[in-house]
Amino acid sequence: MKDGWLPREEWLKMLEARPASAAVLIENSAGELLIVKAHYKPHWGVPGGVIDAGETPLQAALREVAEEVGLTLRPADLTFYAVASRHSSEAMLYQFVFRARLDNERLAAIVLADGEIETYEFVSRQAVLASDQQFVWSIQHWAEGKLGGYVETNMKRDGNQRHETVTQYIAITKKEETWEH
């Protein structure tokens, strides 16, 4: 360290150690959530993936939705939902999660990515809560009707299964709070 600053190469290498991803919770007109099953994952998730170099979380979210389910979203279609700090023994990952509610006409344009997404379905909150299946934290929070905000998770692998536990949750605001300008 020179004069309190890390050498640029060390600083850049440190930044590479904390990758980030983006995902989108997409609801239909009935309030059901679009979930996808990738060929290479044992669990269901939502459209999303790693943020490429030079991309913002918003750009990555829009790109991943287009790549995985063939939907072209605009920034105005999205609202911010949450940011998560996901921890495992292998890595730490930031995940930026957005929400979109689309009419069924737009959702009729879904085309699955060849070789990546196996299938998709729309699920209700009740179906997620009643299921004994393990869902990623964002699907579980959506089903529980939790407000967005900040989330920390701990991910563990057990063979081919991944278990993710929320260890911290701070709501973006409380339902009774309002923000006045």
Residue spans of the language-model regions?
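Short Gly/Pro-enriched turn/cap motifs at secondary-structure boundaries
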Residues: 12-16, 89, 112
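Nudix hydrolase/Nudix homology domain
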Residues: 42-43, 115-181
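Acidic, metal-coordinating catalytic segment for phosphate/diphosphate chemistry
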Residues: 1-23
